[in-house]
Amino acid sequence: MLRSTSTVTLLSGGSAKSPGTPSRRANVCRLRLTVPPENPVPQQKEKKIERKDQPPELSNGESTKKLPQGVVYGVVRRSDPNQQKEMVVYGWSTNQLKEEMNYIKDVRATLEKVRKRMYGDYDEMRQKIRQLTQDLSVSHAQQDYLDSHIQAQASALDSFNAMNSALALDSVGLQKTLVDVTLENSNIKDQIRHLQQTYEASMDKLREKQRQLEAAQMENQLLKMRVESSQEANAEVMREMTRKLYSQYEEKLQEAQRKHSAEKEVLLEETNSFLKAIEEANKKMEAAELSLEEKDQRIGELDRLIERMEKERHQLQLQLLEHETEMSGEMADFDKNRYQQLEEASASLRERIRHLDDMVHCQQKKVKQMVEEIESLKKKVQQKQLLILQLLEKISFLEGENNELQSRLDYLTETQPKTEVETREIGVGCDLLPSTTGRTREIAVPSRSYTPYTRVLELTSKKTLT
C-alpha cells in the first residue's frame, strides 16, 4: 500500500469581497497528494476526470464541508524536482465545458461549410479538411465521452485550446486562399472583359472591311461594264500595244541570247584552263609517284646493304674476340711471333669495324634524308590531290552555272508570247550553240594503280619495321 498525505483547499469568491455583497459558493477544489519517492511512478501525466457530488473526507482532522454541486474535477499527477510525486485536482463548472463544446461545434460547422465551398478546387485543401474532419470526429467522440460520463481531465482543456488555435490558423489560411481565389477570379473576369472588347472591336473592323469590299466589288462591276463597252473601240490600240510589247520582248530575248553565248564562252575557257591544270597536276603526281617508287627501291637497297654491313661487323667482332681471348692466355717465348700476328690482326679488325661503323652511320643518314624527301613528296602529292579536288569542284560549279543559264534561255524561249496579229505574222528563230557539257564530262582523270593514301600507309609501315 502507498502512504500518502492529502490536503484539501477550498476557495470561495466571497472572502475577498465586501461584506455587503452576497456570498458565492466556491467553484475550485484542490487536492494535493504527496507520494513518497521509494515507489517509482512513470513520468507521464495521467489525467482523471471525476464528478464528485459529496465532499471528500479529510484525513487531517479538519471539519467536513459541503462542496458545490455541478463541478467537474480533474486530477493531474506530476513530479517535482525533489523526486516527490504530487497529484493536483482542478475543478471546472459544467457551463464552461458546455461553452467550450458549443464553440467546438460552431468551429466544426464553419469548417464543414468552408470544406463544401472549397471542395474540388484544391487537392491539398481537401486533404487538410479531411484531416481536420478526422480531428473533429475524434474531438466529437471525446465530447460524447465527456457528456456520457460527465468527467473532464485536466489536460483536456489545454488540448482543446491548442486544437482551437490550430483550427483558427487553418481557418485563417482558408480565408487567405479564398481571398487569393477571388482575386484570381476577378483578374480572369477582367481579362474576359478585355477579350470581349477586343472581339467587338475586331468584329466592327471586319464589318467595315466587308462594306468596303462590297463597294469595291460594285466598282469592279462598273469598270468591267465600261471595259466591255470600250473593248471594240480600243481593239486597234491593243493590237498596236501588243506589237510594241512583242518587239521589245524580241529585243530582250536576243540580248539574253548574246549574254548567254558570251558567258558560255567564258565558262568554256575557264573549264578548259581548269582541265589543263588538272592534267598538269596529274602528270606531276605521276612523276612524284615514280620518284617515290624509286626512293622506295633505293631505301630497300640501302637497307639490304646496311644488313650486310651489320653481319660483316658481327663476324669481325667475333674474330676480334677470338684473337683477344687467345692473346689473353699464357704464351711462351716461341709464341711471340704469333702474339704479334694476333695484335696486327686485331688492330686491322678494329680498323675494319670502325670503317664499317662509319659506313653504316653514313648509310643511315642517307636513309633518313631519303625518308624526309619521301615525306615531303607525300605532302606535295596530298597538296596536288587537294588542288585537283578543288578544280573538279570548280568545274562542277561552272557546269551547274552553264546548265542554269541554258535552262533560263529555254524558259525564255518557251514563255515567248504567241499572239496572233491580224495584220501580219511574225516568227523568230535562233540557232543555239551546241552544249559542250558532254565533252567536258568525257575528260577523265588519269587512272592510277594505287591511291596515294595506301602508298603512304605502306611507307609508314616499312619505316616502323626498319
UniProtKB/Swiss-Prot annotation:
Membrane topology recorded in Swiss-Prot or TrEMBL: Peripheral membrane protein
Gene Ontology annotations of biological process type: intracellular signal transduction
Top-rank taxon: Eukaryota
InterPro entries in UniProt: Tuftelin_GRINL1A/MYZAP/CCD68
This protein's GO CC annotations: anchoring junction; cortical actin cytoskeleton; cytoplasmic side of plasma membrane; I band; membrane; RNA polymerase II, core complex; Z disc
Quaternary context: Interacts with DSP, MPRIP and TJP1/ZO1. Interaction with MPRIP inhibits the activation of transcription factor SRF. Interacts with GRIN1. Interacts with DYNLL1.
Stated role: Plays a role in cellular signaling via Rho-related GTP-binding proteins and activation of transcription factor SRF. Targets TJP1 to cell junctions. In cortical neurons, may play a role in glutaminergic signal transduction through interaction with the NMDA receptor subunit GRIN1.
Protein name stated in the entry: Myocardial zonula adherens protein
Gene: Myzap
